[in-house]
Regions:
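Extracellular, repeat-based ectodomains that mediate carbohydrate processing or recognition
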Residues: 1-216
């Protein structure tokens, strides 16, 4: 769509492979490329797998049948992603089976190949980590935000990923808030400058309030 309405006279398939595809998400890069994520049932008819497609500025798909995010035997889901600066896309996602869920990260290059053979384990801890969010680029500051319930209570964690895709902070990231339980809703994050974000959420621990934090 543009300001005048539909751009193409006919819609196009997101993948060259004919399979059931559900739950699409879309992000646009700074230069107009579009990345699409969906749950694909071609190999797993129950839980599905996370797939990605890149669409160029002319509306043409670039990655054929789509890119399977993780070939691990464990279920991969809840993918969140952010366009890079070189035609690539950064992805954070959940991997595993409850109650043992890890937050993983992968980068798909502009050509449709993985930037590292083994996904980066962001949480790297036993127990339940969930609800990843991702903002920024490695050049300007890439932050992965997630919930950690490994201690029994829910902590809000943030990890910064440096150039070369190495975690910046020890202990699986900094703990932005402790013991949130189920009282946090509607998280939002905004890039302010290189290596700096504002993070907001609805906090219901005592009464409904909007909280925010600056993370550098």
């Amino acid at each position: 769509l543009d300001r005048e309405g539909l751009v193409f006279s006919e819609s196009s398939f997101i993948s060259d492979f004919n399979a059931i595809q559900t739950a699409p998400r879309v992000k646009r890069s700074a230069i107009g490329e579009v990345f699409v994520n969906w749950k694909d049932l071609r190999f797993d008819a129950t839980d599905g797998d996370q797939y990605f497609q890149k669409i160029d500025i002319n509306g043409e798909i670039q990655w054929g049948e789509g890119i399977l995010l993780d070939e691990n035997e464990f279920t991969n889901f809840s993918a969140r992603f952010s366009a890079g600066q070189n035609g690539d896309v950064n992805i954070a996602y959940e991997l595993g089976t409850f109650p043992n869920i890890e937050i993983m990260m992968q980068n798909i290059s502009s050509e449709g190949s993985f930037s590292f053979s083994t996904p980066l384990n962001i949480s790297n801890k036993d127990g339940y980590q969930f609800a990843p969010n991702l903002i920024g680029t490695v050049e300007s500051g890439l932050f992965v935000i997630y919930a950690d319930e490994s201690s029994g209570s829910i902590d809000l964690k943030v990890q910064k990923v440096e150039s070369g895709y190495l975690p910046s902070w020890d202990d699986n990231g900094i703990t932005a808030m402790f013991g949130l339980g189920g009282d946090i809703n509607y998280t939002s994050s905004y890039r302010v400058d290189d290596g700096e974000i504002y993070f907001f959420w609805e906090d219901n621990r005592s009464t409904k309030k909007i909280y925010g934090s600056r993370i550098t």
